[in-house]
């Protein structure tokens, strides 16, 4: 495989885009979806891996670019793995994660009133690197932890303010970006395919 010189990072989530750009080497030229007027295909997969593949393959074929796609989300034990692959959709059309977080707290309270003592959760990220010749590489990263009882911190994005990784007291929302990105699910997924970008 030739050295990657430029790549299309397909995600409409600006937080994810920034984090992926920070993970990739500086010598690679990065493009965002804003450069292309292409609608995102329906995510019909039943797993993060399937949805990541759907997006990466679709946009690589449409643009003839090497494409890296991210599909990730939060799984909460008490909610039987929810919101899971629907993590982004819980935020509504306007990506209002304050709304999504409120919904999580309400649903956990519906299942168990003292859910604060039963809040095990995990973040999952699946990355798919798809080449115009049809070859692809996928990887998955998982970080285990629990949900906090309230929103904490203003860093990160999405559900970061309510997720506390195992071994830490702070939420991802309270952590410095450098620390978070050295232990989170996206970093773990990237680390497994890092060799293709060097």
Could you tell me what each predicted segment is?
Residues 2-10, 14-198:
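Anionic-ligand binding patches
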């Amino acid at each position: 495989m030739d050295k990657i010189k430029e790549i299309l990072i397909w995600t409409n989530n600006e937080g994810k885009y920034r984090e992926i750009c920070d993970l990739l080497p500086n010598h690679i030229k990065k493009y965002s979806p804003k450069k292309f007027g292409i609608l995102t295909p329906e995510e019909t997969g039943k797993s993060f891996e399937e949805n990541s593949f759907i997006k990466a393959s679709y946009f690589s074929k449409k643009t003839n670019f090497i494409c890296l796609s991210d599909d990730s989300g939060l799984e909460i034990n008490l909610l039987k793995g929810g919101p899971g692959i629907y993590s982004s959709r819980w935020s509504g059309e306007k990506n209002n994660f304050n709304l999504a977080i409120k919904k999580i707290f309400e649903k956990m309270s519906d299942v168990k009133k003292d859910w604060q003592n039963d809040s095990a959760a995990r973040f999952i990220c699946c990355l798919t690197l798809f080449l115009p010749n049809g070859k692809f590489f996928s990887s998955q990263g998982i970080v285990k932890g629990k949900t906090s009882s309230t929103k904490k911190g203003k860093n990160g994005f999405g559900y970061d303010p309510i997720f506390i990784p195992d071994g830490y007291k702070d939420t991802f929302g309270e952590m410095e970006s450098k620390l978070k990105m050295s232990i989170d699910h996206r970093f773990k997924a990237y680390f497994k395919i890092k060799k293709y970008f060097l």
